[in-house]
């Protein structure tokens, strides 16, 4: 019996996450109010002039999936246990990567459960649509508070990469593209054919300093064949034409050790560092572990060496292969590249410039002096 359970453990895991009710009759969680700070994992103090912030960009981070499913199609944002997990594990590994890059905006949203990415049911697509509506509303508020001289970075992980692709489609195919430093869409497939249809104004990045472009990869360790096949063949990609599987489509793969799309092998000496942080304060900076893996793009997948530290191994638990890792192997690579691309965008001169407010200068009082009449007879 135990042998059968182990053999069919993925099917068992999937069945356990089924909410057991149609999405149409499902009592949806209350929508977040993005005017309220409690609906954000990270948001800057909007009362402080962005000109005074030590960084130059604004970064919108769409967090990965932490909710497996079971009771709900979508995560209620008042689920204190999962929200705590987001704050304790997701934030230090995936959000605070960009602390030194820009002002951070990371909304809580009614993320679709992991189960919705394991089934082809229409209910799953509707749950993902609900999640995107939250992300879109949060991004609209982000834009209202983002000064026009500040570069923008979009960072989405796993489910967040799916929604990030749609943000690019809906907002960055016109003049806003000039403010885009880069979009990091990590852990969900981005087919190259999208750049001929939905993403014509935001092409793939080709170098480490390209701006207004997209970086994307799905990274897999040795032994990850099951989830690699799922990534490249079965996950659905949303475009204006609807949801279509990733199968038989060439996928964008950016090697984060080289910052290009080549199939060259990048040795571990190029790896700037990963972290496996937990419970850190937002201001804390974890110490990255460097030179952990080599990496190579092959067939649209980023194939990794086995990491030197066990901290980056997949947790051995039911459904562990499908869950977001409690670590970010490319934390330091992303941080440094984000800074590089922001500076590159500013150097293009395409963004408006802003001078320091006159309020910060000393005011010199001018005192009238008597005017002596000119005597023309002298």
Predicted regions and their residues:
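Proline/glycine-enriched tight loop/beta-turn segments at coil->beta junctions
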Residues: 51-57
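Active-site-proximal beta-strand/loop segments in catalytic clefts of secreted hydrolases
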Residues: 63-65, 108-112, 157-158, 185-189, ...
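Structural recognition of the beta-strand scaffold that forms the well-ordered cores
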Residues: 58-61, 105-108, 153, 182-185, ...
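Hydrophobic membrane-insertion alpha-helices, especially the h-region
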Residues: 1-7
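N-terminal module-boundary/linker segments of secreted carbohydrate-active enzymes
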Residues: 7-47
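Surface cap/lid and interfacial helix-loop subdomains adjacent to catalytic sites
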Residues: 134-148, 169-314, 319-340, 344, ...
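Gly/Ala-rich beta-loop-alpha elbow adjacent to hydrolase catalytic centers
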Residues: 156-164
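Active-site catalytic motif of lipid deacylating hydrolases and related acyltransferases
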Residues: 9-25, 62-150, 306-377
């Amino acid at each position: 019996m135990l042998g059968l359970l182990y053999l069919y453990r993925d099917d068992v895991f999937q069945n356990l996450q089924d909410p057991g009710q149609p999405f149409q009759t499902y009592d949806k969680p209350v929508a977040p109010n993005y005017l309220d700070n409690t609906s954000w994992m990270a948001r800057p103090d909007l009362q402080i002039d962005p000109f005074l912030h030590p960084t130059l960009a604004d970064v919108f981070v769409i967090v990965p999936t932490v909710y497996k499913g079971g009771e709900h199609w979508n995560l209620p944002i008042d689920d204190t246990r999962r929200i705590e997990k987001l704050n304790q594990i997701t934030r230090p590994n995936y959000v605070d990567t960009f602390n030194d890059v820009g002002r951070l905006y990371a909304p809580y949203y009614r993320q679709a459960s992991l189960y919705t990415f394991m089934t082809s049911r229409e209910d799953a697509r509707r749950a993902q649509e609900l999640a995107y509506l939250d992300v879109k509303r949060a991004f609209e508020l982000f834009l209202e508070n983002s000064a026009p001289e500040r570069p923008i970075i979009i960072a989405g992980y796993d489910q967040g990469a799916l929604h990030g692709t749609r943000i690019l489609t809906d907002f960055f195919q016109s003049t806003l593209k000039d403010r885009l430093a880069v979009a990091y869409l990590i852990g969900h497939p981005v087919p190259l054919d999208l750049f001929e249809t939905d993403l014509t104004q935001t092409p793939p990045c080709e170098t480490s300093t390209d701006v207004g472009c997209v970086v994307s990869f799905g990274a897999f360790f040795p032994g990850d064949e099951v989830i690699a096949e799922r990534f490249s063949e079965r996950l659905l990609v949303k475009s204006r034409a609807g949801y279509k599987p990733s199968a038989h489509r060439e996928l964008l793969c950016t090697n984060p050790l080289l910052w290009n799309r080549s199939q060259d092998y990048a040795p571990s000496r190029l790896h700037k560092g990963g972290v496996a942080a937990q419970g850190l304060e937002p201001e804390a900076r974890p110490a990255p572990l460097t030179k952990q893996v080599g990496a190579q793009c092959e067939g649209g997948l980023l194939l990794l060496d086995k990491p030197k530290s066990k901290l980056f191994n997949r947790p051995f638990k039911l459904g562990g292969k499908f869950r977001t890792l409690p670590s970010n192997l490319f934390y330091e690579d992303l941080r440094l590249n984000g800074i590089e691309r922001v500076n590159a965008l500013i150097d293009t001169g395409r963004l408006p410039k802003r001078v320091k407010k006159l309020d910060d200068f000393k005011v010199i009082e001018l005192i009238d002096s008597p005017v002596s009449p000119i005597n023309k007879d002298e």
